[in-house]
Amino acid sequence: MGQKTHPLGFRIGITRDHKSSWFSNMKSYPKLAQEDYKIRSCIEKQLHNASISLIYIDRKVDQVQVHIHTARPGIILGKMGRGLEDLRKKLETTLKNDTQIRINLIEITDPDKEATLIAEFIVQQLEKRIAFRRVIRQAMQRSQKAKNQGIKIQVSGRLNGAEIARSEWVREGRVPLQTLRAHIDYSYKTAHTIYGILGVKVWLFKGEKIITDKVDN
């Protein structure tokens, strides 16, 4: 049986960075890791329609900086910036400690270059009961317009309400999953339909990164 490696974890330290940036001793590490999980879960639950592709967490001694990469910053800001303040208070309540939280919004100018946002688009269309092949074709066209070098989409489950679940995938361009220097963006989402849950996976190939760091002998 072939073993599948997670395309993002496989490239950490080469073409990808960790989604959190902080150091801790062994005693505090589990607590801080759990806090990161709570922050991400709270943001994703409250802002599920804000087209968020990445939540990056940076910690200092008594401060947590949360960088939210979003294609729709207006939804997070709300009227007169109240939405951002409400989110900050909600996060402070969730953590239940005296840690100061600062939120920084980073706007995504081209959402079709983000695997997470393409996967979200596919999920939204599938939940509206649009035929999966048509949805995949639309996603492929959007990726082509964004000039990605390659894209692979896989949809699994009871496709179009079929009795037996199956998987179908389509690839266009190059998606070199075994090349470590390849800049691959990956996302997995689930669509909840009347026939059950459909799994959606998207791989995007954005080009190769030249690795310049050399180890001195």
Swiss-Prot record:
InterPro entries: KH_dom, KH_dom-like_a/b, KH_dom_type_2, KH_sf_prok-type, Ribosomal_S3_C_sf, Ribosomal_uS3_bac-typ, Ribosomal_uS3_C, Ribosomal_uS3_CS. One of its GO terms (biological process) is translation. One of its GO terms (molecular function) is rRNA binding. It holds the Pfam family KH_2. SMART domains: KH. The keyword Transferase does not apply. Residues 39-109 form the KH type-2 domain. The keyword Ribonucleoprotein applies. Its main location: plastid. GO terms for cellular component: chloroplast; cytosolic small ribosomal subunit. SUPFAM superfamilies: Prokaryotic type KH domain (KH-domain type II) (SSF54814), Ribosomal protein S3 C-terminal domain (SSF54821). PROSITE patterns: KH_TYPE_2, RIBOSOMAL_S3. Transmembrane segments: none annotated. It is found in: Plastid, Chloroplast. Keywords: Chloroplast, Plastid, Ribonucleoprotein, Ribosomal protein, RNA-binding, rRNA-binding. HAMAP family: Ribosomal_uS3_B. NCBIfam families: rpsC_bact (TIGR01009). PANTHER family: 30S/40S RIBOSOMAL PROTEIN S3 (PTHR11760), SMALL RIBOSOMAL SUBUNIT PROTEIN US3C (PTHR11760:SF19). Part of the 30S ribosomal subunit. Belongs to the universal ribosomal protein uS3 family. This is Small ribosomal subunit protein uS3c. It comes from Gracilaria tenuistipitata var. liui (Red alga).
